[in-house]
Amino acid sequence: MTIPHMKYAVSKTSENKVSNTVSPTQDKDAIRKQPDDIINNDEPSHKKIKVAQPDSLRETNTTDPLGHTKAALGEVASMELKPTNDMDPLAVSAASVVSMSNDVLKPETPKGPIIISKNPSNGIFYGPSFTKRESLNARMFLKYYGAHKFLDTYLPEDLNSLYIYYLIKLLGFEVKDQALIGTINSIVHINSQERVQDLGSAISVTNVEDPLAKKQTVRLIKDLQRAINKVLCTRLRLSNFFTIDHFIQKLHTARKILVLTGAGVSTSLGIPDFRSSEGFYSKIKHLGLDDPQDVFNYNIFMHDPSVFYNIANMVLPPEKIYSPLHSFIKMLQMKGKLLRNYTQNIDNLESYAGISTDKLVQCHGSFATATCVTCHWNLPGERIFNKIRNLELPLCPYCYKKRREYFPEGYNNKVGVAASQGSMSERPPYILNSYGVLKPDITFFGEALPNKFHKSIREDILECDLLICIGTSLKVAPVSEIVNMVPSHVPQVLINRDPVKHAEFDLSLLGYCDDIAAMVAQKCGWTIPHKKWNDLKNKNFKCQEKDKGVYVVTSDEHPKTL
């Protein structure tokens, strides 16, 4: 089965642009929905963003992949998001990435469409391999010119379903269906040493019947729809902001800087991050949990709080200390430049550094306070720290008497006792093992984010004039979506140990966060209010440009690239 008229079907549908404005509700939902059939090369599938699909896609006719499915692909790929004055800020943010200006980096036009060839002697197909630069350029081309020209440029006139597969790969995605991948791998050979275009004359250009079943073709078309929608929801890098000097100049002129921080800002203090090879989740694999994240699962906590309190001492933050990076943010506040610091950390070190509560949003809560899960009595978090260090369940004094009745043999505060003592026959079935247990006010999986996050972000994304993401891999939604909420003309800077490949930062400074903060302060002529500043201000830093807008920062203390 060949697909000679697919481009015509897609192009014809693309001519009928969506003229009505996308409603705030539709657009906000679109931002938060996530594709389930494809995963990004650099990001888990549950973190993806996609535009909502029209009903026609949900009931695709699998017996006619050349008819309704082609039209549906064109319909979704050609959707345009147009902001209006009364749109929700979250809706405007997604719509704004579609608009283009002179500040946007213009992509290169490829030399020709994707080439797939077939060896007539053995029937094996030869597919292309793509470089990181080619993938980035393709995504930029789609954003800059739209789906119509993108498909017309990257696909040949006559094509089969394998072209759809390779177009998905070119955009930086991988098909998740293992059965489909197995079929493709059995008929395709990727020559890693030479490009398909350079292979000998024994390889003929593909114009034979489709090697995949109709159902598999439909699956690929759906995946391409999702890939296109994901790309259309992300921003393009700015053409006039890609050097350290650009960053320094912007820091001097910016007045409303939005700072998003993650675990990397605290690792210099000995606090582990969560997802690295040496992070917290790696250290607790020995507990035998199906998923290490279960220690922060709210439902599990309510049924057995000892799961969390067995390891809580490992994430308990040190008191009254903070890093030079925390003080760098405090410096921005002192200069009247800090709009807000959104932190994913639960250690509350920002407050120790002096960042005011009105400038701080603890997206995932913190150890600053604790609350009884039964009567909701609230107290300062430091009052349960000793219990946590001693592997004891912190219990509410107001619920203690009742807990003793429900758990006559296991009412005490030893970790694990409540989960193993006191049978269900001795208490009502609705009384959980967490009765009367104090829980730190950190946001567990299954809990809603604090109201302050939702209230603040709606205003801040429209007011900020610079976004700086520090020490975060941006893998936890909805905080990770902030980079796509901010208007496209606002410069975005990453300061992190490792690159974040699923976001389009204008400038990435890779290295130790404290070092980079000190280097930036030196170049700005500023003083970081931290006890280590006397050493940091005289430190020598080297910046090595790895790619356009990507620099590796090293020092005498940390000479190795990361």
From Swiss-Prot:
InterPro entries: DHS-like_NAD/FAD-binding_dom (IPR029035), NAD-dep_histone_deAcase_SIR2_N (IPR007654), NAD-dep_sirtuin_deacylases (IPR050134), Sirtuin (IPR003000), Sirtuin_cat_small_dom_sf (IPR026591), Ssirtuin_cat_dom (IPR026590)
A GO-annotated cellular component: heterochromatin
Subcellular location: Nucleus, Nucleolus
Active-site feature positions: H364 (proton acceptor)
Residue ranges with Basic and acidic residues bias: 26-36
Keyword Transferase in annotation: yes
Keyword annotations from UniProtKB, A to Z: Chromatin regulator, DNA damage, DNA repair, Metal-binding, NAD, Nucleus, Repressor, Transcription, Transcription regulation, Transferase, Zinc
Catalytic activity as recorded in UniProt: N(6)-acetyl-L-lysyl-[protein] + NAD(+) + H2O = 2''-O-acetyl-ADP-D-ribose + nicotinamide + L-lysyl-[protein]
Residues binding Zn(2+), per UniProt: C372, C375, C396, C399
Entry superkingdom: Eukaryota
Ranges of residues in domain Deacetylase sirtuin-type: 237-527
Cofactor(s) the record lists: Zn(2+)
Note accompanying the cofactor annotation: Binds 1 zinc ion per subunit.
Enzyme class name: transferase
Residues the entry annotates as binding NAD(+): 262-281, 344-347, 471-473, 496-498, 513
Keyword Nucleotide-binding recorded: no
Region annotation (Disordered) ranges: 1-67
Annotated Polar residues bias: 11-25
GO biological process entries: chromatin organization; double-strand break repair via nonhomologous end joining; establishment of protein-containing complex localization to telomere; heterochromatin formation; negative regulation of DNA amplification; negative regulation of DNA recombination; negative regulation of DNA replication; rDNA heterochromatin formation
One MF term in the entry's GO annotations: histone H3K9 deacetylase activity, NAD-dependent
Stated regulation of activity: Its activity is increased by calorie restriction, which slows the pace of aging and increases maximum lifespan. Activated by resveratrol (3,5,4'-trihydroxy-trans-stilbene), which is found in red wine.
Quaternary assembly: Homomultimer. Forms a complex with SIR3 and SIR4. Component of the RENT complex, at least composed of SIR2, CDC14 and NET1. The RENT complex interacts with FOB1. Interacts with ESC8. Interacts with and ZDS2. Interacts with MCM10. Interacts with SLX5. Interacts with NSI1.
Role: NAD-dependent deacetylase, which participates in a wide range of cellular events including chromosome silencing, chromosome segregation, DNA recombination and the determination of life span. Involved in transcriptional repression of the silent mating-type loci HML and HMR and telomeric silencing via its association with SIR3 and SIR4. Plays a central role in ribosomal DNA (rDNA) silencing via its association with the RENT complex, preventing hyperrecombination, and repressing transcription from foreign promoters, which contributes to extending life span.
Family recorded in the similarity comment: Belongs to the sirtuin family. Class I subfamily.
Misc: Its stability is directly linked to life span, which is extended when it is present in high dosage. Conversely, its absence shortens life span. The reported ADP-ribosyltransferase activity of sirtuins is likely some inefficient side reaction of the deacetylase activity and may not be physiologically relevant.
This protein's name: NAD-dependent histone deacetylase SIR2
Species per Swiss-Prot/TrEMBL record: Saccharomyces cerevisiae (strain ATCC 204508 / S288c)
